[in-house]
Swiss-Prot record:
Keywords: ATP synthesis, CF(0), Hydrogen ion transport, Ion transport, Membrane, Thylakoid, Transmembrane, Transmembrane helix, Transport. Belongs to the ATPase B chain family. The gene is atpF2. It comes from Prochlorococcus marinus (strain MIT 9313). The keyword DNA repair does not apply. The chain crosses the membrane at residues 18-38. InterPro entries: ATP_synth_b, ATP_synth_B-like_membr_sf, ATP_synth_b/b'su_bac/chlpt, ATP_synthase_B_chain. This is ATP synthase subunit b'. It is found in: Cellular thylakoid membrane. It is a single-pass membrane protein. The keyword Hydrolase does not apply.
Amino acid sequence: MTSLLLFGAGGLFDFDATLPLMALQVVLLTFILNALFFRPVGRVVEEREVYVTTSRAEAKQKLAEAEKLELELKEQLKSARIAAQQLIQEAEKDSEQLYREALAIANADANAAREKARREIDAQRDSALSQLKGDAEKLGDLIVNRLLAAK
């Protein structure tokens, strides 16, 4: 019974014009699908693949450029920091030098004023001593004269 269903008229393996017609339909449908669907889809897939490949290449190139710029900027920042440190050190040296010069000038002025005051005091002392000597001599002479006059 199964052999009748398989090989009989209208069975699965009926070799009349149906099988070649079906084969022709499959081949024709394959060509139509290939022309209308598979080729355009294949082209879109290839275009997308090319786009992705070029995008990745551009991204890698931009990443390399960004890394290069980052290194350059780090070097510039490093040199700027070094230059700033040098400027700060020079400014500190200059301010220290100015401080020392101002201190030396102030000390010199103070020493000069002290020396001038000492000289004035010495002059006034000498003047006072000489005046006292003169007054003492006058007073001594006056006492001697009064003592002699009193005798």
